[in-house]
Amino acid sequence: MASVTLGSWIVVHHHNHHHPSSILTKSRSRSCPITLTKPISFRSKRTVSSSSSIVSSSVVTKEDNLRQSEPSSFDFMSYIITKAELVNKALDSAVPLREPLKIHEAMRYSLLAGGKRVRPVLCIAACELVGGEESTAMPAACAVEMIHTMSLIHDDLPCMDNDDLRRGKPTNHKVFGEDVAVLAGDALLSFAFEHLASATSSDVVSPVRVVRAVGELAKAIGTEGLVAGQVVDISSEGLDLNDVGLEHLEFIHLHKTAALLEASAVLGAIVGGGSDDEIERLRKFARCIGLLFQVVDDILDVTKSSKELGKTAGKDLIADKLTYPKIMGLEKSREFAEKLNREARDQLLGFDSDKVAPLLALANYIAYRQN
């Protein structure tokens, strides 16, 4: 498959036209074109070039398949650990333990439970790429993590995925009850916008850019984003593979998973003072790694144990959900992930290679993660 693109109109049909999963939806061009492009690497100049240095991969592809390498001088693990620690401190400060204690305990339980912090790190890296400071991006970074945590709390509820384990710990509703878990998610959702609007420095970021950032975040989680993906996802359980295809699955995950990653990068670029061109290139980059994240997640769900993942393994298979391995097969899913990684990296061609290194490494981190 040389190209996989969702156009502005997406038609997904079922033989029974009254099935809730049947959709005729006008998308906001949430597409990530996948083409057979050449890998990229770094030369001595300060821009990203199109020739490559490659090493073997064992997660997304078989051992004989290839991937691109980052500059040997860039230590991505130190970078992401350092940034994640700063995000954790900022989140701890933003959501202190106060009255009513129970709701704040529930919010903090999931918000501070660890996790990769991919979304806030992406937000910070995008801000720094366009010339902004880490401190400028931190309120936006915290906001996207609050919303991500909300989505996990709600996703784990019995009425959704009915999961008992998240980030290696009992899920929120198992500890605090379903009623408080719902409210904790609601509180994180509303506070994310309050924090983004009030904590972003008005001395650095113009009100126009703050309003733009708020609008982007709201769109990413509503009926043009996360909610759209979730409702089509839960309506697709048990569908016959003959009735759905790759476009259907892409619609789900470009909205359910990629939309918030896209917002993370876009918010970072907006508050960092990025140009419209820089913002759109980072949008496309994040859209591709968002879809990549889900493809890899589906692969890990059928190849790793619950202990390795820190969450229940094989739950999508048990729930008869649509996944990339189910539709494409495991090997084709790995090949598709490799194409997504290359396409994402191509969006960063021409940026300063020193500043772009974290984002290139982040794409590979998502592609080759083990949990």
UniProtKB/Swiss-Prot annotation:
Keywords: Acetylation, Carotenoid biosynthesis, Chloroplast, Cytoplasm, Isoprene biosynthesis, Magnesium, Metal-binding, Plastid, Transferase, Transit peptide. It is an enzyme of class 2 (transferase). The modification N-acetylserine is found at residue 52. The keyword GTP-binding does not apply. Expressed ubiquitously. Mg(2+) 1 binds at residues 155, 161. One of its GO terms (biological process) is geranyl diphosphate biosynthetic process. Dimethylallyl diphosphate binds at residues 166, 256-257, 294, 311, 321. Gene3D superfamilies: Farnesyl Diphosphate Synthase. Forms homodimers. Part of a heterodimeric geranyl(geranyl)diphosphate synthase. Interacts with GGR. This is Heterodimeric geranylgeranyl pyrophosphate synthase large subunit 1, chloroplastic.
